[in-house]
Amino acid sequence: MNPLRKKRLLIILAILVGVGIAVGLALSALKENINLFYTPTQIANGEAPLDTRIRAGGMVQAGSLQRSADSLDVKFVVTDFNKSVTITYRGILPDLFREGQGIVALGKLNADGVVVADEVLAKHDEKYMPPEVTKALKDSGQSAPTPAKEG
């Protein structure tokens, strides 16, 4: 083989190996950062993976909020009006967090079926509902409760 062709072949192979490594690293990073959404029904039915970061959302069940007296630990139940799941969280809840309103919690599902959240997101006004929560409520035959009008 001609030395010039051999050099070109080695350069092309090196580029292909580099591109392959870059694509592999990018796919690996994407896989680790994907947080799939699960409804309380899917979590209760065992469809959500254990010890993997997920998003769980629904309506905060009225009367379910429990705050620890001596720490920032919070426990509440989220429902899609079909099934419910308990969520625990350590931290300050968003100002807009209310019972009877939609939330999305990011965290890991433990073996007890409890989502241990490290982030809780509350809807930002009375009309907004995360798309996944809206779909889950629609699928369960329910609709989001409408807030009482002031006046």
Curated annotation (Swiss-Prot):
Heme binds at residues 124, 128. Keywords: Cell inner membrane, Cell membrane, Cytochrome c-type biogenesis, Heme, Iron, Membrane, Metal-binding, Signal-anchor, Transmembrane, Transmembrane helix. Residues 1-8 are cytoplasmic. It is found in: Cell inner membrane. Residues 30-151 are periplasmic. The chain crosses the membrane at residues 9-29. GO terms for molecular function: heme binding; metal ion binding. Residues 131-151 are annotated as: Disordered. One of its GO terms (biological process) is cytochrome complex assembly. It is a single-pass type II membrane protein. GO terms for cellular component: plasma membrane. Gene3D superfamilies: Nucleic acid-binding proteins. The keyword Metal-binding applies. Heme chaperone required for the biogenesis of c-type cytochromes. Transiently binds heme delivered by CcmC and transfers the heme to apo-cytochromes in a process facilitated by CcmF and CcmH. PANTHER family: CYTOCHROME C-TYPE BIOGENESIS PROTEIN CCME HOMOLOG, MITOCHONDRIAL. Belongs to the CcmE/CycJ family. This is Cytochrome c-type biogenesis protein CcmE.
